[in-house]
């Protein structure tokens, strides 16, 4: 990272004191110019975070590692000779919290892990909604505006992608996760504080998102770019593989409900809206097949229903 480019870290405890204005300004600057920021003193118990980290890493060793190695062999990735651009070097499973939890349906998760993840998910849900209200305040929107938009008639969707990025013998040959923007609303990431790998694209350069103990990394999805009429941006990010260390990632996605109507907030449109209006589920159906392609054609396609098929969506993506 360049010396004059300091990744934004926000201490949420300062919102309650004399430094509130400066803290709100830091959040706004991060949303406008980075699409990412890291938060500390966020209210999540450190012992719960430690428990989630330990259980996630233990679960990988006991339940996921062999499956990952089998996948490598089945796809011929156990002996990389040429660069691979259509597969990610990651082991994942998904937890859905809202509208209805699937935790009890995940058979290889222990009861203790299930209980901890349920607690963690609820706390992250509340944190996500608090953060959305902070964005509303910075944007001059009424408190609760973003939460109301996300709600639709069925409530928001909220889920967690639990990932491990094992050591890769040839990191130059394959990405842990290919570059993309996130389709949804606001993302809260609890990442490994020892093994790095997450990068975002800023001003043409890939910038490391620094591992920081007990922090939560926040990034904005495509829906917030649309609602803010481009004032805030979703940003390309990726995970690079490492030769040493198994990187843990617990990413929780607070997204609009399937029938939520997404459009630029009227107060943020000065002349003509730069972004389309659509139903969130329609956007997700498009995104599923073009996740690793630029976002701009997706926005353009949503303005013209006939153009959606031209992007040829084929792949599946977890929408929780």
UniProtKB/Swiss-Prot annotation:
Lineage: Eukaryota, Viridiplantae, Streptophyta, Embryophyta, Tracheophyta
GO biological process terms held by the UniProt record: cellular response to fatty acid; cellular response to nitric oxide; defense response; detection of ethylene stimulus; ethylene biosynthetic process; positive regulation of seed germination
GO cellular component entries: cytosol; endoplasmic reticulum; Golgi apparatus; nucleus; plant-type cell wall; plasma membrane; plasmodesma
Keyword Protein biosynthesis: no
Family: Belongs to the iron/ascorbate-dependent oxidoreductase family.
Tissues expressing the protein: Expressed in vegetative tissues. Constitutively expressed in leaves and blades. In ethylene exposed etiolated seedlings, localized in cells at the outer side of the exaggerated hook in an ethylene-dependent manner and following an ethylene sensitive pattern. Also detected in the root tip when treated by ethylene.
Organism whose genome encodes this protein: Arabidopsis thaliana (Mouse-ear cress)
Binding annotation for Fe cation: 180, 182, 237
Enzyme class: oxidoreductase
Record InterPro entries: DIOX_N, IPNS-like_FE2OG_OXY, IPNS-like_sf, Oxoglu/Fe-dep_dioxygenase_dom, Plant_2OG-oxidoreductases
Official protein name in the record: 1-aminocyclopropane-1-carboxylate oxidase 2
Gene ablation phenotype (knockout): Impaired in the 1-aminocyclopropane-1-carboxylic acid (ACC)-mediated reversion of the ABA-induced inhibition of seed germination.
Top-rank taxon: Eukaryota
Record carries keyword Translocase: no
Cofactor note: Binds 1 Fe(2+) ion per subunit. Can also bind Cu(2+) ions.
Induction summary: Upon iron deprivation. Induced by ethylene, particularly in root tips and hooks of ethiolated seedlings. Promoted by ozone O(3). Accumulates in response to very-long-chain fatty acids (VLCFAs C20:0 to C30:0). Induced in roots by nitric oxide (NO).
The protein's required cofactors: Fe(2+); Cu(2+)
The protein's Enzyme Commission number: 1.14.17.4
């Amino acid at each position: 990272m360049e010396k004059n480019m300091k990744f934004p870290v926000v201490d949420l405890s300062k919102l309650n004191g004399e430094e509130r204005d400066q803290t709100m300004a830091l959040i706004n600057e991060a949303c406008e110019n980075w699409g990412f920021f890291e938060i500390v003193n966020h209210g999540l118990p450190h012992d719960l975070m430690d428990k989630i980290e330990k259980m996630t890493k233990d679960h990988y060793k006991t339940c996921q590692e062999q499956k990952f190695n089998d996948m490598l062999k089945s796809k011929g990735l156990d002996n990389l000779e040429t660069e691979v651009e259509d597969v990610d070097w990651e082991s994942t499973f998904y937890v859905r919290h809202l509208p209805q939890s699937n935790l009890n349906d995940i058979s290889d998760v222990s009861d203790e892990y299930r209980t901890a993840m349920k607690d963690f998910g609820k706390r992250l849900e509340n944190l996500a909604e608090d953060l959305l209200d902070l964005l509303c305040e910075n944007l001059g929107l009424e408190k609760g505006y973003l939460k109301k938009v996300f709600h639709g008639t069925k409530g928001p969707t909220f889920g967690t992608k639990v990932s491990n990025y094992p050591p890769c013998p040839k990191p130059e040959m394959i990405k842990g996760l290919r570059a993309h923007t996130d389709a949804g609303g606001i993302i809260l990431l609890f990442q490994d504080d020892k093994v790095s790998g997450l990068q975002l694209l800023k001003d043409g350069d890939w910038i490391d998102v620094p591992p920081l103990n007990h922090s939560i990394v926040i990034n904005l999805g495509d829906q917030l770019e649309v609602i803010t009429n481009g004032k805030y941006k979703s940003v390309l990010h990726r995970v690079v593989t490492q030769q040493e260390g198994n990187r843990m990632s617990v990413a929780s996605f607070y997204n609009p409900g399937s029938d939520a109507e997404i459009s630029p907030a009227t107060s943020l449109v000065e002349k003509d809206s730069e972004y389309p209006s659509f139903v969130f589920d329609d956007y997700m159906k498009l995104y599923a097949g073009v996740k690793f392609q630029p976002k701009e054609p997706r926005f353009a396609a949503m303005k013209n229903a006939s153009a959606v098929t031209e992007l040829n969506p084929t792949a599946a993506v977890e929408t929780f």
